[in-house]
Amino acid sequence: MPLFKLTGQGKQIDDAMRSFAEKVFASEVKDEGGRHEISPFDVDEICPISLHEMQAHIFHMENLSMDGRRKRRFQGRKTVNLSIPQSETSSTKLSHIEEFISSSPTYESVPDFQRVQITGDYASGVTVEDFEVVCKGLYRALCIREKYMQKSFQRFPKTPSKYLRNIDGEALVGNESFYPVFTPPPKKGEDPFRTEDLPANLGYHLKMKAGVIYIYPDEAAANRDEPKPYPYPNLDDFLDDMNFLLALIAQGPVKTYAHRRLKFLSSKFQVHQMLNEMDELKELKNNPHRDFYNCRKVDTHIHAAACMNQKHLLRFIKKSYHIDADRVVYSTKEKSLTLKELFAKLNMHPYDLTVDSLDVHAGRQTFQRFDKFNDKYNPVGASELRDLYLKTDNYINGEYFATIIKEVGADLVEAKYQHAEPRLSIYGRSPDEWNKLSSWFVCNRIYCPNMTWMIQVPRIYDVFRSKNFLPHFGKMLENIFLPVFEATINPQAHPDLSVFLKHITGFDSVDDESKHSGHMFSSKSPKPEEWTMENNPSYTYYAYYMYANITVLNSLRKERGMNTFLFRPHCGEAGALTHLMTAFMIADNISHGLNLKKSPVLQYLFFLAQIPIAMSPLSNNSLFLEYAKNPFLDFLQKGLMISLSTDDPMQFHFTKEPLMEEYAIAAQVFKLSTCDMCEVARNSVLQCGISHEEKAKFLGNNYLEEGPVGNDIRRTNVAQIRMAYRYETWCYELNLIAEGLKATE
C-alpha cells in the first residue's frame, strides 16, 4: 500500500487503493474466511492485536536504517505535556503550530485541579514510519469531514479546524457563514403559523439529474444545461474519499495507534475522576439554583409515532371512545365505520383493554427481531387502530394523532426543562406526501415551544418497487426533495409547506441496518434513474444522495434567508462499519453508534471530530444489545460527544417522563455522577436543532466557544474542571497528529 497522500499533494486514489477498499468491503459484507480487515471484535482486551507480533514488528522496524535527522527530531519530541503550554508572552521563537498551542486560553474561571503529565508518549507503540502514516491518514480524514460539513452548512468544531489550518501553515478565519440556520422561536404574541411574510417567487427552474436536483435561472438555461453555481457534490470525489477511509480503517498501524489512544483516554479519565471528583462536586454544590433536574436536556432521537408511553395511548383510546363512539372515523371499501363499529369489527371493547392486551411494549421476543418490533406499532395487533391513532393521513385527517402529540408537548412544557425532536415520516412514494403532512401540521396547529421536528425517510424502496409504486430510485428521491425545492423557490404558492419547513431542523434515514444489500457503492453503480431493479440500494447509496440534495437545498435556503437542514441518520445500530464511515463523512450527527466499538479507527475519528451521538440504551436492550454491554459509559469516559435519547417511549418506557427514566436508569446502572449527567444533558442541547437564541439562553452566550470558556456553569451545571479536562485532552490528541506531521517536514 502506498503512503497516504496529503490533501495538497493531489487527491486521486490509484487503482491499488480502490482494489484494497473493495477487498475490505467484500471481506466484511460477505463474511470471507480468515482474518477480517475490519475487526469484528470490541475495542477492549479481546481486540486481536497480538502483543508478541506487535513487539517483534516494532523491534524489527526500529533496527532498520532511517534518516538520522528525522529520528533526532522525533526523539526530541518524546515528551509531550498534557497541560496547556506557555503563554503568548514567551520570548521563545515558536513554529506556527506551537504558536497556536501556546496561545490557548488560560481559563481564569477554572479552579485549580490535578492534571496528569505523560512523558515519552510520542508514537503510542508504533514505529516512527508507521506514526507518520497514521498522522497523515488521520489528518486527511479530518480534512475530508471538514470539507463535507462546510459545503452543506453543517457543523465542524473550531478546535480541530485550528489545528488543521496550522498544519497547512494558514491562519484560521472565523466564518460563521458555514453555520446552520434554525428558525428562532416566535416572539410573544406572534403566530408560529403566519404566512404574511413569505418571500416572493424566484422563478427558478428545477430538474433532477443523476439523482440530484439542479437549479436553473430559467427554462432556457435548463435546456442549455447551465445551472446556477451552487455546490453540487462530485460523485467521483466522494467515492475517492470513501475508498481512502475504507483503506484507512483497515490499516494495521492505524488500528494499533487508535486502539492504544482510546485505551489511554479511558484510563486517563478514570485517573482524572479519582483525583478531581470531589473538586467537581464542590463546584456543583457551590452553584446556586441549578441541579440536574433544572438544567436543559433534549430527547435528540424520538419517533413521533411512538412518542407517548403505552399508558398514555391506552388512556387516550378509552377517552376517544367515551367522547366519539358514534363518530365516523374509519372507511373501508365496503362502508364507513363509527368508532363503536370499528371496535365491534375487531371483537373488542376499549374498556376491557389493558397495557398488556394493548401489546405495544417491546419484550424478550423482539431481541434481534426487528420485524417483530415493527409489529409493536399496531395496538392490539390491529393495523386499523394504528391507522386511526398513529397516522397523519386517514379518514379524520390525523386528528387523534395530533391530539396525542399535543398532550405529549403539554407534558414537556409542564416539565419545563425537557425538550424533544420527534421524527415524522416522508416515504417518497408519491409527490403529494409533503402537502398532506404540512396541511396536517398547520391545520391542527401542532406547535410546542419544547419541540422541534425532523423528517425521517425509511429506506424501503424495495417494498415500493416490488409493488410497482415507483419506476426507479430516482423517482423516490424526486418525490422526497422536489416539493421542498419548489416551496423554497416559491413559498407563496405553497404556504402550508413553507410554514412547516420553518419548524423542520433536519433529515433522518431510518430502517433495519442489519439488512445487507450486498452492493458496494462505486463508480460502476447505476445512477438513481437507472436503478430499476427491486433490490434495495446500499446504506451509503441512500446517504450520499440524501446528503447531495440537502447540500444544494441548504445553499438555496441560505441564500433566501431561510432555515437550513442537518443530515442526522440512524447509524451504527447494526450492520456494516461502512455505515459509520459514511456518517463520518457527511452526517452532522448520528443516532445509536453502537458499532463504533468494533472499529478503533472510526471511534477515534468520532472523538477527534467530536461528532454527536444520540444513544438509546433502553431501546438497544430490547433489540440489539443487552444494557450492561452498552458502550455508553465507555464512550463517555473516552470523551466522545454523546447524549441520551428515548427512541420509542411507547415500546421501551413506563413513566410519564421517558427521558428522565432514561437518565435515571443509566445513572443507576453505570453509576454516573451529577456532573456526568449534566455533561450528557449539555451535549444534548448542543447536538439538537433548537435555535441559536434558545441555546444561548440554555447554555450561556458563549456556548459556541469550545472548552471551559464556552461553559456557563450557572446554566449547565457542568463543572469547569470537567470542561477544562475535556478540552485539554482533546487538544492533546490533536497536537500529537500535528507534531507527527511537523516531524516529517
Curated annotation (Swiss-Prot):
Pathway assigned in UniProt: Purine metabolism; IMP biosynthesis via salvage pathway; IMP from AMP: step 1/1
Subunit comment: Homotetramer.
Modified residues (Phosphotyrosine): Y214
Phosphoserine modifications at: S83, S439
SUPFAM superfamilies for this protein: Metallo-dependent hydrolases (SSF51556)
N-terminal signal peptide: none
InterPro entries linked to this entry: A/AMP_deam_AS, AMPD, Metal_Hydrolase
Organism superkingdom: Eukaryota
E.C. designation(s): 3.5.4.6
The name this protein goes by in its record: AMP deaminase 1
One of the protein's GO biological processes: GMP salvage
UniProt keyword Membrane, yes or no: no
Cofactor: Zn(2+)
Binding site for Zn(2+): H301, H303, H570, D647
Similarity annotation: Belongs to the metallo-dependent hydrolases superfamily. Adenosine and AMP deaminases family.
Entries under Pfam families matching the protein: AMP_deaminase
Modified residue annotations for Phosphothreonine: T79
Organism expressing this protein natively: Mus musculus
Positions with a binding annotation for substrate: H303, K372, F373, N374, D375, K376, Y377, E573, D648, P649, M650, Q651
Catalytic reaction annotation: AMP + H2O + H(+) = IMP + NH4(+)
